[in-house]
Structure formats: C-alpha cells, structure tokens
C-alpha cells in the first residue's frame, strides 16, 4: 500500500515545519473550546481471543495517534476506543454489549504503542466506572453502534495521551477524501494480532455506494463507509470501536467509530463506521448527565 509519513506529534502533518510539542499545540487548540455480544461481521474480538489489526496497514509511529485507546477485557486487547476528554472514551456498542455490567473486567490502556510494552512509562491505565450504550443500538441492523465509557480517574494529558476533536454536525467530508484508521486488530481476515499499533489510509465512500456494496444492511445516515474498490486496506477484528479520522484545519477530527464489515479488505466491500457527527448531541448530553444519580 502506498503510504506517506504524515505526522510526528499527532495533530499536524510533519511537513508543516512546526516545532511545537503536541501538548503545547493541544493547549492552544483545545483549551478555548468547551468539552464538547458480537457477531461475525463485528470487528471486535471474541472472548477466546481467536478473533482480532488493520489490514494493509503499516506500523504507526510512536505517539502518532495520542487519543488511541486499547480496551482490555480480562487483561487482553479486545477493541479500540478514542479519548474525547479527560475521562471519556468513545467506542462501539458491540464491543461492550453484554459486558457493560462487569466494569471490573475492563481497563483502558492509553499512550500505548506496542501491546508487549504495557509497562512503558508513557502508558496510562484506567479503570472504567460507567458504560453508556446508545439507546438506539440494534445488534442485528448495526444501527447506532456507538457507546461511551467513563474513566474512574481522569488521564493526564501528555505528548502520548491527548483527546481527538469530534466531527460536528455541519462538517461535511466528501467521498474520495482520504482519512486514517488505526488499531491493534487483525492484519488479514483470519490473520494474526499485531504487537505494534497499525495505521492505514482509506478513502471515504459515497453513501449510495455504501448501500450498493453492503446490500445485507440498511445503510443509514448515521453510518459511513470507507475503503478502496480493489480492497486490501480495511479495519478488521480487534479494530472495532477505534477511530476513523480526517485531518481538518490542521486538527485530527474523529468522523467514524469502527463498526462492521463483510470480511476484511475484500474488494467492493468497504468497512462500515458509526458516523460521529450523527451522535454529537447524544455525546454532549451523556457528558452533561449527572454522574451520581445513575449509579
């Protein structure tokens, strides 16, 4: 796969000549804005761990995607998630479905580069104290495959751990636009789990085309899909819940949450994602809803 090295510090392409640290850039860009059960097609890992990398990807540079989270269930990677604030993650509903009452089995691993280096000094591990699955989630149709996780303790923002911007309702990302996916999921359909975080570039696909190429599903306005007609680059089992992100005004913006697909990287079978912009008000309401009266 043709791939260009795109950035060193997470928020700005490397060619921009900026010497600012990611943390300083974060302060500048974000501090003024307000905190804004699985099935074959799901891209989560099965409990046995025999299911789970980005297909056609390359090793990410360390620190390239500081909002990337590895969600561990009973001590092993099961899904991805994105950090969207000091104590909130966005992931896929199917990752947490049926496991949302067993909070003690979950841990969120942030600042991670390789699964084998969990004890690296950049890594921050947090327990989860609340999981909220979107009430419109439908396991069969894959509608509203999105969930939020609240961390027991907020993370510390560092060069390695930073939140991603969320796509707003009015932002339009046209078909053909190249965006990035990342994850520790399988490197091929039925393939193995990588140690190092993988990333790949995929073009966004027109909504009608998504429906045509994924006729088994009703492709709604709260979904989007991405991939090459010839296949070969895609998210796969173990990538679910992770980010589909586009560089917009020098900021990485989360536009999709890895949701489902038919196989991985097959020609004419783009990967499907929950469309973040369709859920921005739900995300904001969930953040605001008081914490104490729900527990």
Where are these regions (language model features)?
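Extracellular/periplasmic catalytic domains that process cell-envelope and extracellular macromolecules
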Residues: 60-64, 83, 100-102, 139-142, ...
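Protease-domain processing segments flanking chymotrypsin-fold serine proteases, especially trypsin-like
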Residues: 1-85, 89-90, 111-112, 293-295
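Solvent-exposed loop/turn segments at secondary-structure junctions
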Residues: 76-77, 95-97, 115, 138-140, ...
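Extracellular trypsin-like serine protease catalytic domains
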Residues: 68-74, 177-295
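Conserved H-D interstitial segment of serine endopeptidase catalytic domains
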Residues: 89-92, 97-139, 200-203, 207-210
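Conserved hydrophobic/aromatic beta-strand scaffold that supports enzyme active sites
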Residues: 68, 88-90, 123, 146-150, ...
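Active-site substrate-binding loop(s) of clan PA
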Residues: 132-138, 154-194
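Conserved active-site neighborhood of the chymotrypsin/trypsin-like protease fold
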Residues: 89-93, 143-168, 196, 291-292
